[in-house]
Amino acid sequence: MLVIHRRIAPQALWAAELLLNFEARSKSRLRCFSADGEDVGLFLERGQPPLHDGEFLQAEDGRVVRVCARPEQLLHVTCSNAFELTRAAYHLGNRHVALQVGDGWLRLLDDYVLKAMLEQLGAQTETIEAPFQPEHGAYGGGHHHSRHGDEDFNYPPKLHQFGVRL
């Protein structure tokens, strides 16, 4: 098994390629196969952005591995003007949809419910096969509800008694 722990800078040569869809590129722990069929175990640092097309990894045995975004079924969204495209992006963002943004277009994983919503908003949609590389997000840490890092603001609860004070 090819065991990988490290992301590395771009390289001129590589020994293996991983063809991964967006969901697989988002995982820090993954068992998969190289393009040549070799068993691969990814054990990357948690909390990092998803792997992107063209990124390089280094295996424990020193081999360099190139990540390739596998084409997947996407909705390619266009609108007749910038206002409508911005409105479509707003509604998709409000639903926390992973979104790839281009010059005059949006792309998201194919979903019939979102397609109907977009068409109701006046957008034109087309189903395509292409690699998916959505925006990572403005805050980089992902969406969570943990209280990690709130130690300085961890006050004991108070019992409030409402009514007449004597």
UniProtKB/Swiss-Prot annotation:
Q: Where in the cell is it found?
A: Cytoplasm
Source organism per UniProt: Pseudomonas fluorescens (strain SBW25)
In its UniProt record, which GO terms are filed under biological process?
A: protein folding; protein-containing complex assembly; urea metabolic process
Region listing for Disordered, in residue ranges: 133-154
Is the Cytoplasm keyword given for this protein? yes
Where is this chain primarily localised? cytoplasm
- A Pfam family cross-referenced in the UniProt record is UreE_N
Q: What is this protein called?
A: Urease accessory protein UreE
Q: Which GO terms describe its molecular function?
A: nickel cation binding; unfolded protein binding
**Which SUPFAM superfamilies does the record associate with it?**
Urease metallochaperone UreE, C-terminal domain (SSF69737), Urease metallochaperone UreE, N-terminal domain (SSF69287)
Q: Which InterPro entries match?
A: UreE, UreE_C_dom, UreE_N, UreE_N_sf
Q: Which HAMAP family match?
A: UreE (MF_00822)
Taxonomically, the superkingdom here is Bacteria
